[in-house]
Amino acid sequence: MIDSRLPLTDIHRHLDGNIRAQTILDLGRQFNLALPADELEALRPHVQITHAEPDLVSFLQKLDWGVAVLGDLEACRRVAYENVEDAANAGLHYAELRFSPYYMAMKHQLPVTGVVEAVIDGIRSGSRDLGIDVRLIGIMSRTFGEAACLQELEGLLAHRDGITALDLAGDELGFPGGLFLNHFNRARDAGLRITVHAGEAAGPESIWQAIRELGAERIGHGVKAVEDPALMDFLAEHGIGIESCLTSNIQTSTVASLAQHPLAKFLRHGVMASINTDDPAVQGIEIEHEYLVAAPQAGLTPAEIRTAQENGLKMAFLSEQEKQTLRDKVRG
């Protein structure tokens, strides 16, 4: 259930993993690009998960068609604006949308800084038009290596006023966090908040590294934390939040079934964990599904689901005053 008296948040939601199938079709036609299908329903299986993928990298390949059609900066702006529309239509009061500017720029060799600017512009326009508070998290896509991540970081820092936090995502096994120490030092010096994808494909040591070496205040996914009792204690004691994405973890085969998902264990151990989507368009789900279907199947009680909803706002990269304003607004 969703408690209508509390703000509904989604703080782990990839903008470039939430490109509508219709938009992929539209932009493919606009830029005369060869798509795997030229009708919406025929295209859908190519851009949306229809069954669990064998691993994270296979899952991520489903995202590639969405960014393949970003033929100019206006297309990036359109996708950003539509992401705000989707968040508002999902009933969210607050969302943190994350994006990898290098990934979005790569196919058509767009300027990384230009992509950042276009996304910020689309988000600001959407927030203004739709009355929803949306913040941006810049991603460094570790899969493309240290130099590409440096390009991303510099593009994000060039528009620091529009970016709230920095993340590291992609191939966690092939590109461990230790490769990016200098990147995160610069980000923290610039005042960016820090969240890191960790403990999704790699083990608890990846989470420890994200916290101790990269300065992570929150962990994306973090499912492997349950394998390390000392880490579970540390997360609970220091208020380091886990951004749980239930359906996503099944679709990437990170977790075998919802019944085995560690979210309930996190909450019962006092770890601050929240419920989020990840890549809604690619997954074919929305936040309501995660609360009404996935969370109960993961063994959460109604009280635990409510706690997870509260945690979403507690974990948000907002000031305490901004959080209280949002609570007051929802209470009406």
Curated annotation (Swiss-Prot):
Cofactor note: Binds 1 zinc ion per subunit.
Site residues, Important for catalytic activity: 221
Pfam families hit by this protein: A_deaminase
Residues at the catalytic site: 200
GO biological process entries: adenosine catabolic process; hypoxanthine salvage; inosine biosynthetic process; nucleotide metabolic process; purine ribonucleoside monophosphate biosynthetic process
Family under the similarity heading: Belongs to the metallo-dependent hydrolases superfamily. Adenosine and AMP deaminases family. Adenosine deaminase subfamily.
Name under which the protein is recorded: Adenosine deaminase
Organism: Serratia proteamaculans (strain 568)
